[in-house]
Amino acid sequence: MLNWDKEYLKLCRKILEEGTVVENRTVNNTIKLPSYSFTLNVKEEFPILTTKKLFSRQAFLELLWIYQVQSNDVNWLQDRKVSIWDEWKIDDKGYWNAEQKVKNPDGTTSIGEVHKYFGEEYKGTIGEAYGFITNKYHGVDRVLDKIINHKEDRDNVLSIWYNNHLDKGVLRPCVWSHEVDITNGVLNMWVHQRSCDVPLGLPFNVTQFALLMNMYARVANCEVGTLSFSIKDAHIYENQVKQIKEQIERGKFLSIYEGYKNTDWLEGQLERYTIEYNKIYDTLSEEEKSNLKKGITPDVIREVMTIKNVILYTLNPPKPELYLNPDVTDFYKFNNDEECKDAKVLNYKDLGRLYIPVSK
């Protein structure tokens, strides 16, 4: 199992075992830890989850949208078949609509429709947030100047938290700043997050900032080192608990089967569980088969499918590495078309999709 998978599952277990249930603006309560931090060695291992499928193309394009293209236009993502921000897109009349908890006159709360008006000039965007901020305040240009001309400086910080813009964006920045340090030719990064949807957001965030630090390192002509995350309010929504428990279960089976070194025995077990999986699969309804492709696993087949996938993983373990086009040294010239051909994860393998709902 990869180091990032181990760290991630440790955090998930800690939230479920020690977290506090709290209400929030969405219709789903969260289980939260007030703070959490970790450090990953990106030089030794490119961090991408394998205990569930991570769509790196979409993750990379979102990162480029914010820091390279410096845009708040959701259409840019949609043109590249990235739907991450669809739920937060301001409509053609200038409204953003959501179902959230609202306070009643008597002080109680209920679920209601929220319609926030931003203005027609913001249609198709997320308002004054993320890429809007990086563009307006030229934060990336400052980072690039520092890593090229002032490597020794201790103030290489990029923040996208500006109080005068917070109410003009649909969503306030979750990852709100990062810092860069170069020492002895090694670039390290610290990422600060005020709120973290651990099942959905964190897997993307870690892989994205691992890409960003590699892009910075390319520009600065240095190596990558460690990536550190500091999180306030690390949480799991209550409607995500079942899926996270399934992912934790995958990790448990993986820990068990990785201990077996007898390849012949593992291949025999693979044949056994494949036959059993096929038998159960044939009994599923068409709806269940369709859901399975989306990452919604019927209980009747979950354990057998997990063990089969774990054995396949164990027989040929993944060794993910980042391919970053070696011919590109200009931060703004890395390809950001739909294919995202200048940045790819090689040698990646996962234990299958998990459908995890969004709360907004």
Region locations from a protein language model:
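Terminal, non-catalytic protein-protein interaction segments that mediate quaternary/complex assembly
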Residues: 1-360
